[in-house]
């Protein structure tokens, strides 16, 4: 059950503040979902290249039923835990100060009452959508973490504005990307990457709600250590 709180109303374990949640269609029209969302899930994992999520909606006005998903629809919201004051501890997917998620499919359509439909909207980060529409055909020389940063940030590829937290690679190879999607290209580079300061083999490229990471398993286990640097997007 999605709960909307203001101020000190959200004080129980598992509660959170979700001040608004809007669907923005490809024409820029805004549909207020605040009171028809019954469930919201956000997924992140070191085994996933992008953050994804889903919301379950009960729709008595057929607002979503008329929506043809074109990959341009967005979900905008702000999510925080009770008592959170630091902006960096919030999930800001608002239009004004953050980056909304993109809807990529609708599933589980069913009628649950007279004139009432229920749907699940699946959404993902902007980079997830860019990955579906872009290919990389490029040769890279030098440190492999630099190649990853280029694929993540350059306009021709993922064009991400999010921060990348990375561990420098110890090997500098020439690598040729043979017309792959950006995530596949980065995963290929990750498999060939060697840490600069440990004996591990292979890196993980993943997204959290705050940023992207490119680091070895040892670095993940040690969390943020002195050999992990921050690169602003």
Regions inferred by a protein language model and the residue ranges of each:
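Acidic/histidine-enriched alpha-helical segments
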Residues: 204-216
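Amphipathic, non-transmembrane alpha-helical segments in extracytoplasmic/periplasmic proteins
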Residues: 54-55, 123-124, 132-161, 177-205
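Assembly/oligomerization scaffold segments
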Residues: 1-133
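Generic beta-strand structural signal
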Residues: 117-121, 173, 210
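Short, conserved phosphate-binding/catalytic loop or strand-edge motifs used
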Residues: 125, 160-173
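Single conserved hydrophobic/aromatic residue that forms the stacking wall/gate
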Residues: 224-232
């Amino acid at each position: 059950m999605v709960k909307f709180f203001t101020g000190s109303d959200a004080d129980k374990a598992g509660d959170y503040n979700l001040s608004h949640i809007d669907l923005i269609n490809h024409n820029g029209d805004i549909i207020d979902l605040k009171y028809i969302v019954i469930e919201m899930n956000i997924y992140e994992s070191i085994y996933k290249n992008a953050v994804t999520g889903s919301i379950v909606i009960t729709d008595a006005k057929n607002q979503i039923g008329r929506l043809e998903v074109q990959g341009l629809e967005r979900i905008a919201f702000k999510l925080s835990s009770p008592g959170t004051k630091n902006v960096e501890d919030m999930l800001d997917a608002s239009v004004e100060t953050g980056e909304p998620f993109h809807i990529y499919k609708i599933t589980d359509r069913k009628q649950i009452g007279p004139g009432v439909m229920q749907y699940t909207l699946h959404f993902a980060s902007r980079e997830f959508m860019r990955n579906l529409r872009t290919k990389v055909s490029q040769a890279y020389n030098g440190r492999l973490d630099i190649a990853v940063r280029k694929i993540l940030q350059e306009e021709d590829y993922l064009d991400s504005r999010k921060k990348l937290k990375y561990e420098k690679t110890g090997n500098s190879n020439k690598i040729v990307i043979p017309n792959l999607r950006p995530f596949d290209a980065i995963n290929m580079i990750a498999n060939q990457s060697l840490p600069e300061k440990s004996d591990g083999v292979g890196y993980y490229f993943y997204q959290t709600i705050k940023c992207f990471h490119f680091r070895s398993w040892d670095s993940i286990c040690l969390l943020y250590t002195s050999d992990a640097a921050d690169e602003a997007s």
